[in-house]
Amino acid sequence: YKNQEYGLDWNEVHERYARRITSDMTWENLFEVLSDMVNELRDGHVNLSSSLATSQYREWFDSYPRNFSDSIQSIYLGKDYTNSSGLTYSILENNIGYIYCSSFSNGIGDGNLDQTLNKLAICDGLIIDVRNNGGGNLTTAQKLAARFTNEKMLVGYMCHKTGPGHSDFSEPK
């Protein structure tokens, strides 16, 4: 995919960065080289982590078009809002419910979701604002979306790495 979309030849990247790695380099230098290599993917969802540091490709977020302003949100919400399990919610003018979900990284508890939706059930409309959401756990996003349909629906496929080989992945499920 990366080769088709971006012209990235991962084998060439591997060869180029392998030349920079030596047996006597420090842990910090090795981490820096590997971080640079992983950043070639230009993917904000790929990180290199250790007990001492985390490297991430921030440009995807920093260069993302800004379509969200905390100050505008504070004008609409004022101080009359509730935070519950990663959700910020309130009832706006004209009896419109508003839920802001800034991340799917943390789980949303069923009880918290029940409380949020029960409070907003009296509303004439509902806005679910996921602008500036950095992503996270697909299960969390599915849990929120499932509250708005009675039908089971396919939302995507997942594959898992199953071995050290280049193409060692599970079947899409």
Task: Tell where the protein language model's regions lie, with residue ranges.
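Flexible, low-complexity junctional segments that flank or bridge functional domains
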Residues: 1-173
